[in-house]
């Protein structure tokens, strides 16, 4: 009996094992078959897999190399190397569907957007019931553990277009249970295009929609911005990366209901024409946030700093660099912003910033330090007959203890002005009303010659000497201005007229003679009052001063005498000016050269050293213009290089770079819409090698001309050093002449005579020179 019972048990186990085994063996391929047979019927999409393993006794499912295709397409919508899940069968008895574990191995999903439609819209429509069932189901659902390893998410937008993805996506969550409101987990991923990583943890209450998260971002590439920028800009490039360490709590249903703290930094920011030319850049923009809550109207920062910012604004003949990029008055941006059928990340960021900025000033705010360090703000004007360039560098701005509850907040700005000068501004402002502030500013040591591009274009007269200072005090209450502004131009000297077509002519020497006060100084105070909307410039005070200056010179003050003496001493250093592109010595300079020659002949042991100081940028610009105009002239006259003579050279030299026919010639030859300036067009036409050759030839010709003015007997006492390329304070290339020891009186006197210092009223000198 025992043997029979034992035998029955063994046979039963064998049968059970065979039944289970056969069930598993047959149900797995059957599952694969049924899925692939009815996939399109129930999902509208083709689903494939290498193999399936299903255990109906344990509730374990495993699909290998699962692939779900796009609707009526061979392209993949979703794939996963392995999909595994465990269903608790016993819980089904209690009307509970519980997935104890769900694992996705290297899943790849693709989201495609076309206007307002997505590539998963059909799935939502297929599985969404026609009528919402409001009856309470008796079934409960839980998923206890979710794990995603090595995933990828791709996002494609067809209109702009956008192509972006993240990789190495890892998510691990304790899941959600039917009787627990919260879901928690951790996540991490890498940038698919570029560098950088993101990791963090989250906790969401599914009932109240409250959330909290900790987020750490390291050097995450923001190049997706460049793809959205292409819809806004006619051209351009963008790159930057993000660092962040943020802790936040909030509510999903209200975007304003968020409170966060931590650090946010945008690094290595570059935006510009191309990869080599930036319009805006910075090394780091960093915010240290102590407490930020739009809903509570609270903005507290430990610091906000912008480090090494760079900004370049350029004016062209009919537009500027920003309008050339974004359309006239930002037309491209407005068009995209007004199109509600499109999503543009840049527009949405701008809208969010605008809302937060409005909320910021309506809230309590405190910033312990707001700073800009080592900035470089550049302005180029190519709309003139020659390029004007200036910049604030290094630009520094600091404001400490900015607090809305304080009566006054102070800030200071200090900057160098290049090519010459410096600026300082101090401001005391009411944080509750920006229409209340006091300001003092001072701009000093600015070279008058640096404005020669404007003077030549609008008067035809450059200056080769002079210094500008501007300072003032503003007291503003409730938007009403009371200010005194003081303009001082020290010892300006007008040089020879530049005769060019398309250049206005104004008798600048005569005007200077009217407006200069005693001591060769222009000194005026210009009060400004009124409001910001309707400021009043008290020009009548200047006019009365001008009229008085014509008939009665002000008394000679100690200050102006000191200024004159300082300027007089400055000019006692020996220099020999070279007007732009000139190689011959002027008759007025010949006397000075003869004095040097006589001194060297009388003192054989003496020697002088010449240090050429070349204004390379300006000389090369003039050479470039000449060579480009020469090409145009020769094409127009059908001439060759051999037949180009001095008369032709004079005609080319007198031709304006603003000549309409010349500009049409450049446009027709080059056919490049990305060349915005006359300098760029001429450079592409001529080539840099020809300009460099012309500049070297110019330097050699000047050296030969200078040496040929001396007798052979003294040439051994003259040494000409290698040149130095600079931006000269007085606006022209020059030779610096050094003599070992104190400068001999005879040379100093000859030099002073060369300068023709004007001790008499300059107006009288100008009038005497007229017929």
Predicted regions and their residues:
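Extended terminal
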Residues: 2-13, 292-297, 302, 361-365, ...
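Terminal hydrophobic membrane-targeting helix
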Residues: 19-115, 132, 137, 143, ...
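Buried hydrophobic packing residues in well-ordered domains
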Residues: 39, 63, 83, 102, ...
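Transmembrane beta-strands of outer-membrane beta-barrel pores
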Residues: 106, 152, 219, 266-268, ...
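Transmembrane beta-strands of outer-membrane beta-barrel proteins
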Residues: 214-216, 261-265, 305, 440-442, ...
